[in-house]
């Protein structure tokens, strides 16, 4: 019971008590404070500054003139639509409906967009790692470039562009709200994503390199044009797997969940399927 009271006392403080603390004491106490009563504008601003000093990302809501300093110094200042003009000018955005649910929805959309960017980077870097290794592998076995410059440009400019639009437009998911907050200094490609990029890129390379070696040893004259065309088509078709991997990245659901509702994803899959056929007809 005594421990609970002590913990509760640490979570509550008055404006006068907060002002009486030294900077060192305020720095240590800031992480435990949950309620501050009779707080003046300078007290709120100091609390924001101490939390920022501890590396926290601080958002402040307020509707009065006395909230303006804290709204201005916070990373994200959120004024209420019914608040004063001073509070609105000091804030970064205004909640027109005065609802905390709008803040939660904004966080959900932001986290979902961040995850979609991670998905696109995963997709594109896997393609680039596999293509780079294939070009190097082709030079090792003494064959001509298995992927031509035109083919690489097609993959990067056409397929990657539409894949970016499809992955970036995936609808937000409530499951991102269960994630822990990230530090502002965290790199967008974390260790697990980096490992997945290398693993999938190497697997794609091994599959395609085995096909390249087979075509090289199959004929006496090396790899002919038709085999290179088949090689490129196979490389593009493997990106089906890559795209589904990217869609399911860091998700607890299968990539086929709500598949028919993802029109952008369907468009990319059609493009991946039809594109190589059209390219082959033009080159032949």
Feature roles, as predicted:
Residues 67:
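Conserved cytosolic catalytic loops of P-type ATPases
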Residues 71:
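Basic, alpha-helical nucleic-acid-binding regions used in initiation and control of genome expression
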Residues 279-284:
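Conserved small/polar residues in nucleotide/adenosyl-binding loops
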């Amino acid at each position: 019971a005594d421990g609970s009271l002590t913990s509760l006392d640490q979570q509550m403080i008055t404006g006068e008590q907060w002002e009486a603390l030294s900077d060192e004491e305020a720095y240590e106490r800031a992480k435990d404070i949950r309620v501050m009563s009779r707080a003046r504008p300078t007290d709120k601003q100091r609390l924001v500054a101490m939390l920022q000093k501890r590396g926290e990302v601080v958002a402040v809501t307020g509707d009065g003139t006395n909230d303006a300093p804290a709204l201005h110094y916070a990373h994200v200042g959120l004024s209420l639509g019914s608040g004063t003009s001073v509070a609105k000018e000091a804030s970064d955005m205004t909640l027109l409906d005065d609802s905390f649910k709008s803040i939660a929805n904004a966080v959900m959309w932001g986290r979902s967009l961040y995850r979609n960017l991670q998905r696109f980077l995963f997709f594109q870097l896997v393609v680039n790692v596999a293509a780079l290794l294939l070009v190097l592998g082709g030079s090792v076995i003494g064959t001509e470039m298995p992927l031509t410059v035109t083919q690489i440009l097609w993959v990067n400019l056409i397929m990657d562009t539409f894949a970016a639009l499809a992955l970036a437009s995936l609808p937000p998911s409530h499951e991102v709200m269960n994630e822990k907050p990230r530090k502002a200094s965290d790199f967008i490609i974390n260790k697990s994503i980096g490992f997945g990029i290398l693993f999938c890129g190497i697997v794609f390379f091994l599959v395609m390199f085995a096909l390249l070696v087979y075509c090289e040893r199959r004929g006496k004259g090396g790899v002919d044009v038709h085999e290179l065309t088949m090689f490129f088509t196979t490389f593009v078709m493997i990106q089906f797997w890559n795209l589904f991997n990217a869609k399911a990245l860091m998700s607890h659901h299968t990539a086929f969940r709500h598949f028919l509702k993802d029109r952008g994803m369907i468009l990319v899959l059609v493009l991946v399927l039809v594109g190589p056929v059209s390219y082959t007809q033009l080159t032949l």
